[in-house]
């Protein structure tokens, strides 16, 4: 018989730096799982990507065991790194924040493809381009 799922918790945590302090502790403490076990395992698996934010989806079962799935970093985070900026523009219509090339856009779309609701790479590029536009990042040919 399959285990019964009691909760699904979604978090965005810095790679290799998860600690039982907020936001991890309060989110997982209510589910009754071993927070330190999750933190150690997460930090081990994401140690190669230190400096990026890695979303994680934790499935908690009735016997207090858990499994988790690591997702790709948020598109905004990837775009900021590619454009070499700290944050997006506060006034996207009038003020630009930076720019990326079409090749960089394609590379970001390929990276995000598993987590996007897109059937092909062109659709994924349009999704990432929309995020870039809302951040004030221009796409150069």
Swiss-Prot record:
Record's CDD domains?
Answer: Ribosomal_L11 (cd00349)
Native source species: Herpetosiphon aurantiacus (strain ATCC 23779 / DSM 785 / 114-95)
Q: Family assignment? A: Belongs to the universal ribosomal protein uL11 family.
Gene name, per UniProt, is: rplK
Free-text function comment from the UniProt entry: Forms part of the ribosomal stalk which helps the ribosome interact with GTP-bound translation factors.
The molecular function terms in GO held by this entry are: large ribosomal subunit rRNA binding; structural constituent of ribosome
GO cellular component terms?
A: cytosolic large ribosomal subunit
Q: Briefly state the modifications made to the protein after translation.
A: One or more lysine residues are methylated.
Q: Assembly and partners?
A: Part of the ribosomal stalk of the 50S ribosomal subunit. Interacts with L10 and the large rRNA to form the base of the stalk. L10 forms an elongated spine to which L12 dimers bind in a sequential fashion forming a multimeric L10(L12)X complex.
Pfam families reported for this sequence: Ribosomal_L11, Ribosomal_L11_N
Gene3D superfamilies found in the cross-reference section: Ribosomal protein L11, C-terminal domain, Ribosomal protein L11/L12, N-terminal domain
SMART domains, per this entry? RL11
Arranged from A to Z, the UniProt key words for this protein are: Methylation, Ribonucleoprotein, Ribosomal protein, RNA-binding, rRNA-binding
Q: What is this protein called?
A: Large ribosomal subunit protein uL11
One GO biological process this protein is involved in is:
translation
